[in-house]
Every structure is written in C-alpha cells, then in structure tokens.
C-alpha cells in the first residue's frame, strides 16, 4: 500500500511539474515566437533549471506541441459542431467566429501562438504531429465551406475566392492577439460579433 501511495504521489508530482513548464512556456512563446524561444527562457519563467525542463521535455518543440494540443482540438471540435448545426450561412459564420474567439480566450496565449507561427508552414510543420497540422488546416477549411455555402445559397457575394476569404477571416481573428487579453473591456464574444458584423456588411447579398 505504501509503495502504491508513493507511486501515485510521484505521478501527481510529475504531472504537476509538466503543467508548470507548459504554463510558463505560454508567455515566453508569445513574447519571442517559437524561433526565438529557448529552453533556458522557459526554465527561467518556470523558476526551474534547464536540466529539469529537459527531464520532462526533449526540446522546445515538444513543449510547443503539448502546449497547443488541447486548444487546437477544442477549436476544431467546436467548428465541426457549428458546421453540422441547422443554421443559415450568415449565422453559421457568426457562430464559427464566436467559437474561434472563445477558444482563443480559454487557451490564451497558446492558440494565438499556433496560428501566428503559421500552421501549415513548412518550418512549423516539421516540428508538429500530423494531427495538429491537419487540425490547423481543417479550421480554415470549415470557414471556407461556410462561405461556399453562402455563395451557393445566394446569400454571399465575394470579390475574393472563398479560400482566400477564409484565410482573411482567420487572419483577422488572429490579429486580435496584438491587443486582446482575457477579462478585458471587450469579451471574446463581443469581438467576434463585432467582426462578424463588419465582415457580413461587406459580403451579404443585398436586395435592391
């Protein structure tokens, strides 16, 4: 019994230390980007020595992968649910943008880091698991599908190809990383709704 209790304690301590490192990595990655981040900087932020960080993670890319995994999974899962809901394209686009901003708020700053670093870029992809790469692309594809649906129904009129427009929408949301902080004057949903109205005012087909 004592041995089992000790093993449980060891597992709990191991998990807690990993979480401490992952939490410390967020602000370091946000400040420096993946390229400018070092294990030394993460260790300083966590109040640990470099050797301790290396004990838990093989390199900064392993930290990066784990730090963003849950947020990316939640974001894509949320967008999948919205894509299946019985909504008109304008409402689906609005709810998709809300879903993205809510996920950004809950997983701040990890999700911003993922998209800022260029999900789908060759440099980043070499250090990500295939499921993360696919998830980043899936998020844009779901926005694109909503745009195509709106064009098909006659509700949207675009001056850009749907794929480019989807990148514009995601890029606009990503840009909020320059100024958005959780619990600020504007909530994630406030921002999403305001941006959606701005977007829709430019693409919704108006009746003459």
Language-model-derived ranges and their functions:
Residues 20, 28-62, 66:
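Helix-turn-helix
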Residues 17-25, 42, 67-71, 75, ...:
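Generic hydrophobic, amphipathic alpha-helix propensity
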Residues 17, 21-29, 100, 199:
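Short hydrophobic clusters on alpha-helical segments that form packing/core surfaces
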Residues 84-86, 125, 136-165, 180-183, ...:
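Hydrophobic alpha-helical bundle segments that form small-molecule/ligand-binding pockets
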Residues 66, 80-109, 162, 166-169:
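Hydrophobic alpha-helical connector segments
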């Amino acid at each position: 019994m004592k041995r089992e209790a000790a093993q449980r304690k060891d597992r709990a301590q191991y998990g807690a230390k990993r979480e401490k490192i992952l939490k410390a990595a967020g602000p370091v990655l946000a400040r420096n980007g993946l390229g400018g981040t070092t294990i030394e900087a993460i260790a300083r932020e966590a109040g640990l020595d470099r050797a301790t960080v290396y004990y838990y993670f093989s390199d900064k890319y392993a930290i990066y992968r784990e730090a963003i995994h849950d947020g990316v999974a939640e974001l894509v899962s949320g967008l999948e649910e919205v894509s299946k809901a019985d909504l008109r394209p304008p409402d689906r686009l609005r709810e998709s943008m809300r879903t993205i901003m809510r996920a950004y708020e809950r997983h701040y700053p990890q999700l911003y880091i993922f998209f800022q670093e260029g999900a789908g870029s060759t440099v980043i992809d070499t250090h990500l698991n295939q499921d993360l790469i696919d998830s980043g692309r899936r998020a844009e594809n779901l926005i694109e599908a909503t745009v195509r649906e709106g064009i098909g129904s006659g509700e949207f009129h675009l001056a850009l190809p749907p794929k480019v427009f989807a990148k514009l929408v995601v890029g606009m949301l990503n840009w909020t990383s320059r100024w958005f902080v959780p619990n600020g004057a504007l909530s994630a949903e406030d921002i999403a709704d305001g941006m959606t109205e701005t977007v829709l005012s430019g693409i919704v087909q108006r009746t003459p």
